[in-house]
Amino acid sequence: MTIRIQKQDFDAGYEIKRLCARNTSIGGVCSFIGLVRETQSGSSVKAMTLEHYVGMTEKQLVKIEEEALDRWPLEESLIIHRYGRMVPSEQIVLVVTASAHRKAAFESCEFLIDWLKTKAPFWKSEETPKGKEWVQARASDDMAADRWQK
């Protein structure tokens, strides 16, 4: 189980291959890659900046990952989340889950990204033609995370 918060980009294919090579019990792998969009709520986005609270963010991601491990029989998981300034089409986040069977891999991957979007302490600002604006939490993200409440 690996969590990395980093400024530099990542190679998703390499990361998945490396994760699978560690464990021959894996029968299914699911991944999610989040990208910077060029539009948000109808506005053009020139760039996005993500900030985080060093130490607190890592602890929260560990808790989220532990919750997934309590719910599904995962063999491996990987969360890579970037911070800093990124432009449209750049990768932001990679979530990979691996299990003996596909159902656990699919469900846990969806759970991790839903909870990461709402429970991990990242702050996002966007550069638009109007200037730099802080992005508020979206109700749709909260609803997606709420469906996983026990």
Where do the protein language model's features map onto the residues?
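Short glycine-rich or small-residue beta-strand-to-loop segments that form or flank ligand, phosphate
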Residues: I92-S99
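N-terminal, polar/charged subdomain of small-to-medium soluble alpha/beta proteins
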Residues: M1-I92, F106-E110, D114-K150
